[in-house]
């Protein structure tokens, strides 16, 4: 029997994992500047955590969730997105309390799961980096989160970005617009896709997000939510636009954008790239927005929030397509060459000692001859080789070679063990 990874998953091998670590560390560095701290939540949650928060008519709930009943007959799902689990933790741990500084800022990283048709940049197990900020109903925080998302993508050298912004308004806005949209769509009901027919009276805003070509034609002339904003919703959106202008962030308004999850209101946004990874077609890499009601749905007090999620696989596809050389290094400082069985123990002690001094060190474990060991040192791009044979062992010395220019010096083992750093310059200069 041939065992293979499940469809829609990927093995991240050591040659690739360094890129992932680089992306994650860059994100952590930026989030720290914005005062966001990491939260780690379970990979699986109760089914209701997502069915209540994502919306009963969303594709995630109706088509894409990996859910099952465990041995205790509990309905469990693998998390399809990061926000709901963070909100559940926020409520369960009473982080809404007055003793916790607001806004409460947190970020997460990890795998998510959706049963979708696998394609480039969209797998069934995929990875997200996301942020959430709770407890402040202020458009300024919406803009800060958007600015942070732009900063993050630009930190990877991505400058050809398209920021699309919309507002879903407040509850009154959505109720008024909902009815207007139903009135517009009902004459076209027979022409709508099956999914859109089902959503027409349950959640007509989701029809705007349909991928069906006929649906797209129909909604092209649909009324705009921007014409139904209440005074408060209009003020919120105008402030967002003004602050984006103040920060010099270019954006376009897309009044048909609704996002794939039902919990958003007020500001929503998507950041797209036209990288050659997507054949020059604008493709969403990062998206998010403002939400109210989500904390209450999971048992907490009324608490607004704002956040975004970024697809790591898509970001890496862009970086690969742009052929950017990522500053990823796992340098080998010293390769210790042992000649003869009698040097086995001292070679092991030397590599351990060098590691304890803060250097990266390695040695041969296959009993290869010196020629083979030097080949390994070359393949591993070792900066130095430290060679010890039976004669050197008797004299408590070793041969230190700077691989870049071939300079060699004889060094005392005691000096290697006590202060290898002082020997580096001597070897480089050949003194």
Curated annotation (Swiss-Prot):
Pfam families: HGTP_anticodon, tRNA-synt_His. InterPro entries: aa-tRNA-synth_II, aa-tRNA-synth_II/BPL/LPL, Anticodon-bd, Anticodon-bd_dom_sf, His-tRNA-ligase, HisRS-like_core, HisRS/HisZ, HisRS_anticodon. Its EC number is 6.1.1.21. It catalyses: tRNA(His) + L-histidine + ATP = L-histidyl-tRNA(His) + AMP + diphosphate + H(+). PROSITE patterns: AA_TRNA_LIGASE_II. Its main location: cytoplasm. The keyword Cell cycle does not apply. Keywords: Aminoacyl-tRNA synthetase, ATP-binding, Cytoplasm, Ligase, Nucleotide-binding, Protein biosynthesis. GO terms for biological process: histidyl-tRNA aminoacylation. GO terms for cellular component: cytoplasm. It is found in: Cytoplasm. The keyword Aminoacyl-tRNA synthetase applies. GO terms for molecular function: ATP binding; catalytic activity, acting on a protein; histidine-tRNA ligase activity; transferase activity. Homodimer. Belongs to the class-II aminoacyl-tRNA synthetase family. HAMAP family: His_tRNA_synth. This is Histidine--tRNA ligase. It comes from Ligilactobacillus salivarius (strain UCC118).
């Amino acid at each position: 029997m041939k065992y293979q990874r499940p469809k829609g998953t990927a093995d991240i091998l050591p040659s690739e994992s360094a890129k992932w670590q680089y992306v994650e560390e860059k994100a952590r560095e930026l989030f720290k500047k914005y005062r966001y701290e990491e939260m780690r939540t379970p990979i699986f949650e109760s089914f209701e955590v997502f069915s209540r928060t994502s919306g009963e008519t969303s594709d995630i709930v109706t088509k894409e969730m990996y859910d099952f009943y465990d041995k205790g007959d509990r309905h469990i799902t693998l998390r399809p997105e990061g926000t709901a689990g963070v909100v559940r933790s926020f409520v369960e741990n009473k982080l809404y309390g007055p003793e916790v500084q607001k806004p409460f800022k947190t970020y997460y990283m990890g795998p998510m799961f959706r049963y979708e048709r696998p394609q480039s940049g969209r797998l069934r197990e995929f990875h997200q980096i996301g942020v959430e900020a709770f407890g402040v109903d202020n458009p300024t925080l919406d803009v800060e989160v958007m600015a942070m998302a732009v900063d993050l993508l630009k930190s990877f050298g991505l400058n050809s970005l398209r920021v699309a912004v919309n507002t879903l308004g407040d509850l009154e806005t959505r109720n008024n617009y909902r009815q207007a949209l139903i009135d517009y769509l009902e004459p076209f009901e027979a022409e709508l896709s099956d999914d859109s027919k089902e959503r027409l009276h349950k959640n007509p805003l989701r029809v705007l997000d349909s991928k069906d070509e006929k649906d797209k034609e129909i909604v092209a002339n649909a009324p705009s939510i921007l014409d139904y904003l209440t005074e408060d919703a209009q003020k919120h959106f105008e402030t967002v636009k003004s602050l984006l202008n103040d920060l010099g962030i270019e954006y376009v308004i897309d009044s048909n954008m609704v996002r794939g999850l039902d919990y958003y209101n007020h500001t929503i946004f998507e950041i797209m790239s036209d990288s050659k990874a997507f054949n020059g077609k604008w493709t969403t890499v990062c998206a998010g927005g403002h939400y109210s009601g989500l904390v209450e749905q999971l048992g907490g007090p009324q608490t607004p929030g704002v956040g975004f999620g970024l697809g790591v696989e898509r970001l890496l596809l862009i970086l690969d397509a742009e052929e950017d050389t990522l500053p990823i290094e796992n340098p080998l400082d010293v390769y210790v060459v042992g000649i003869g069985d009698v040097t086995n123990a001292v070679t092991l002690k030397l590599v351990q000692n060098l590691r304890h001094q803060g250097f990266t060190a390695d040695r041969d474990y296959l009993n290869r001859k010196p020629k083979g060991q030097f080949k390994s040192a070359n393949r591993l791009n070792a900066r130095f080789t430290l060679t010890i044979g039976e004669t050197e062992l008797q004299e408590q010395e070793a041969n230190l070679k700077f691989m870049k220019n071939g300079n060699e010096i004889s060094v005392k083992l005691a000096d290697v063990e006590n202060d290898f750093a002082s020997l580096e310059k001597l070897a480089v200069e050949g003194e």
